[in-house]
Amino acid sequence: MKNEQYMLKLVLTDHWFDEIKSGRKIHEYREVKPFWVSRIYSCSKAYAEERIKRLNKEYDLVTTGNEYVEFQKAYRKNAEKMIFKIKKMSIRNGKYTDLHIDKWVFDIELGEKIR
């Protein structure tokens, strides 16, 4: 794919990969933690901690350089992969997501399947 620098890469368990592949799951969630902030915003973990403070207070809609998300089915050799356009990314409480946590989470809404 031409725009790999604009791609967020995520590894999923077989169950969640298959849910997305079937179209039953159109949102992927990641807890707002330094690790995920640094991956989503392509920044250092030190900067990520400062960014988290602002995210929780100032933002709902998330703007990043990521245009696509690539899902990999588990950690295995020659793992199946899918690429989707990111329709929208926002921050919400994770209580009513499939994470079921009362914390801030990134809500990655999937758009068109590219491959």
Where are these predicted regions, by residue range?
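Structured alpha/beta reader/binder surfaces that contact nucleic acids or chromatin modification marks
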Residues: K2-M7, V11-R115
